[in-house]
Design a protein with these regions (language model features):
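Conserved acetyl-CoA-binding loop of GNAT-fold acetyltransferases
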Residues: 120-135
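Conserved acetyl-CoA-binding loop-helix of GNAT-fold acetyltransferases
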Residues: 86-100
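A short beta-loop-alpha structural element at the N-terminal edge
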Residues: 1-18
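Conserved acetyl-CoA binding element of GNAT-fold acetyltransferases
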Residues: 71-83
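Conserved beta-strand in the GNAT
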Residues: 53, 59-67, 74
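A short helix-loop-beta-strand connector motif used in the catalytic cores of GNAT acetyltransferases and
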Residues: 41-53, 74
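Conserved beta-strand-loop-alpha-helix junction that forms the acyl-donor binding cleft
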Residues: 108-124
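Conserved GNAT-fold acetyl-CoA-binding loop/helix
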Residues: 21-40
Length: 142
């Protein structure tokens, strides 16, 4: 059963890092697992940032991690396992959370994992079109 949007816990870091490192490897990029783990842990420990997951029967299938800063907001990671990208119960909570947090604000991005259309369609030159994303969310909620 697919869970609601939940905060990522410190014990989830290894699993999330495995997703990131595996995807990098499949794209021919070599990563340092320690560096990836340290970066994710830093983002998650700072509760001013946001780190959320969705699980299916206790297994993480999607996550978002974003940084809130005084001068800039950044979507650090947006990942949805491929077979869950058409699930409304996964996509609506993830995209709604971004709209809720960043409506009327600028949202940059670092890495959009595996071209998740719901986000990449609204991404251009390092910035997410939050208004366009909100229209998308409203459309798929119906």
């Amino acid at each position: 059963m697919i869970s609601e949007l939940k905060e990522i816990e410190l014990e989830d870091i290894a699993i999330i890092c495995n997703y990131i490192n595996e995807e990098a490897r499949s794209n021919g990029v070599i990563t340092d697992p320690f560096v990836v783990s340290s970066n994710i842990e830093f983002l998650i420990r700072d509760r001013y940032n946001g780190a959320y997951k969705i699980e299916d029967d206790g297994v993480i299938v999607a996550f978002i991690i974003y940084e809130r800063q005084y001068h800039e907001n950044t979507l650090a990671h947006f990942y949805v396992e491929p077979r869950y990208r058409t699930y409304r119960s996964v996509m609506i909570p993830l995209t709604s959370k971004l709209v809720e947090e960043f409506k009327g604000k600028r949202l940059n991005y670092k890495k959009l994992h595996s071209k998740v259309d719901a986000i990449t369609h609204y991404a251009n030159n390092g910035e997410i079109d939050v208004e366009g994303l909100e229209e998308f969310v409203n459309r798929i909620k119906r």
